[in-house]
């Protein structure tokens, strides 16, 4: 489809008028499961290509659609959403996604078409790089009852989305913008209650990090509780170490949880962690932050466990740990 030469904007307007003037304007219903709908009778391959070019040919559709009357805009909304495959082709295109988002602001009647199409293809829309922004726009501007139905779907598929390359980005955007207290708390609870699963996932860990950045004390405490006993294991891993470092930045209870995990592990394991590619950053950050925050017994217990093995840490990048340990005076 994209290999066909793009038609000019004036040609597109002429084509729209030609299609609409063949007979009195009527808003076609979505296609039925059996037989042929009005949409299929009127729609030709050329019509589909013209509309595709119109929707994807410009980054700014605002001026182009400002000259269209209500009837034509309603017809466009139906045309774009009546066929699922065609709707996805438009939404997956960068400019097409932006154009649809602009059309979604035009009227509540038009938004009904877009809402139905998004809900019909919810997962496909949410895990696409550009299509997901169409759904997010819907959650901003649709009426409350429609937004709540979309939120219900988000809660149902939250863990699936969190572990998808683009789904995790969309989910983070929704968490950031969600202003309904009930749905926000429910979504945050899903993330925090599944913190261990998500922290071990290449994409899910970004969602846990995002929630920790929001500094919600209830969710942060819940995440720390779910990860208690697993901080050493996570610190060895690239993505898991990011979560542990985020918990350290929160301080207080999460930091104490991490120190207790490190103290509970065998000395051999702790030294391996301090020498590992990812774990050394966790140990170093822990030593830098805990001196003025933790109780003396916890802090010096960790220092005393590491200091006898400083000679094993004399290599890059662990040399920073050695310098920190060497600068500390540990009380007898």
UniProtKB/Swiss-Prot annotation:
<dbReference type="InterPro" id="IPR011989">
    <property type="entry name" value="ARM-like"/>
</dbReference>
<dbReference type="GO" id="GO:0005737">
    <property type="term" value="C:cytoplasm"/>
</dbReference>
<dbReference type="GO" id="GO:0003729">
    <property type="term" value="F:mRNA binding"/>
</dbReference>
<keyword id="KW-0677">Repeat</keyword>
<dbReference type="GO" id="GO:0006417">
    <property type="term" value="P:regulation of translation"/>
</dbReference>
<dbReference type="GO" id="GO:0010608">
    <property type="term" value="P:post-transcriptional regulation of gene expression"/>
</dbReference>
<dbReference type="InterPro" id="IPR016024">
    <property type="entry name" value="ARM-type_fold"/>
</dbReference>
<dbReference type="Pfam" id="PF00806">
    <property type="entry name" value="PUF"/>
</dbReference>
<feature type="repeat" description="Pumilio 3">
    <location>
        <begin position="153"/>
        <end position="188"/>
    </location>
</feature>
<dbReference type="InterPro" id="IPR001313">
    <property type="entry name" value="Pumilio_RNA-bd_rpt"/>
</dbReference>
<keyword id="KW-0694">RNA-binding</keyword>
<feature type="repeat" description="Pumilio 2; degenerate">
    <location>
        <begin position="118"/>
        <end position="152"/>
    </location>
</feature>
<dbReference type="InterPro" id="IPR033133">
    <property type="entry name" value="PUM-HD"/>
</dbReference>
<keyword id="KW-0810">Translation regulation</keyword>
<keyword id="KW-0963">Cytoplasm</keyword>
<protein>
    <recommendedName>
        <fullName>Putative pumilio homolog 17</fullName>
    </recommendedName>
</protein>
<comment type="function">
    <text>Sequence-specific RNA-binding protein that regulates translation and mRNA stability by binding the 3'-UTR of target mRNAs.</text>
</comment>
<feature type="domain" description="PUM-HD">
    <location>
        <begin position="1"/>
        <end position="302"/>
    </location>
</feature>
<feature type="repeat" description="Pumilio 4">
    <location>
        <begin position="189"/>
        <end position="225"/>
    </location>
</feature>
<feature type="repeat" description="Pumilio 6">
    <location>
        <begin position="265"/>
        <end position="300"/>
    </location>
</feature>
<feature type="repeat" description="Pumilio 1">
    <location>
        <begin position="82"/>
        <end position="117"/>
    </location>
</feature>
<feature type="repeat" description="Pumilio 5">
    <location>
        <begin position="226"/>
        <end position="264"/>
    </location>
</feature>
